[in-house]
Amino acid sequence: MQIYVSGIHTDVGKTHFSAAFCANFNYDYFKLIQAGTPTDSEFIAKFSPKTKIFKEGIFLQTPASPHLGKIKEKLDYKALDIILPKSKNLLIELAGGLFSPMDENYTMIDFVNIFKHPTILVAKYYLGSINHILLSIEALKQRNINLLALVMMGKKDILQDDFIKNYAKIPIINLDFFDENSILNKDFKEQMQEILQLKIP
């Protein structure tokens, strides 16, 4: 299965989740657009060294919204020309949030909507995150994009999780930020396996 990893915002933990997912389920990894360094692929290589990592779809030197980096660096690319690697089990990490621009005409959610694959939405706990989560879920539902689960990064907030589950009727998976010694997480692995019916290696 090919799966998109989308976020409610930038810096919510998409790459942390991607590293844990790839390490626990032997998935390959592809970053759709990389803006700036150090790269997310380098993070994956550090925490999940056995993961096959494909070259980024687009690489930008500028650590900014891709459409701005494209202009600043005078690059010529079209978002919809990015070709996804031919891999049976592939995690495709998007950049920023669902409505982060890819170029002058398209956002991340446009790409997901056109090149349909199921999606995992990643969020973390902060003031205002419930609003961002529900808006993101609604945007995916309106486009009939298959949302597999919501992953909440960081120390678990039971009250927030309960509200989101009751309101949005979506399964929630919890994953704390980790280091090299805790990336192989039994609870995370079992939660993912139960929801997605993934084969545990």
Curated annotation (Swiss-Prot):
Cofactors that this protein relies on: Mg(2+)
CDD domains tied to this protein: DTBS
Record field: catalytic activity: (7R,8S)-7,8-diammoniononanoate + CO2 + ATP = (4R,5S)-dethiobiotin + ADP + phosphate + 3 H(+)
Keywords: ATP-binding, Biotin biosynthesis, Cytoplasm, Ligase, Magnesium, Metal-binding, Nucleotide-binding
An annotated Gene Ontology molecular function: dethiobiotin synthase activity
Pfam families: AAA_26
GO cellular component terms given for this protein: cytosol
Subunit structure: Homodimer.
Record's protein name: ATP-dependent dethiobiotin synthetase BioD
Organism of derivation: Campylobacter jejuni subsp. jejuni serotype O:2 (strain ATCC 700819 / NCTC 11168)
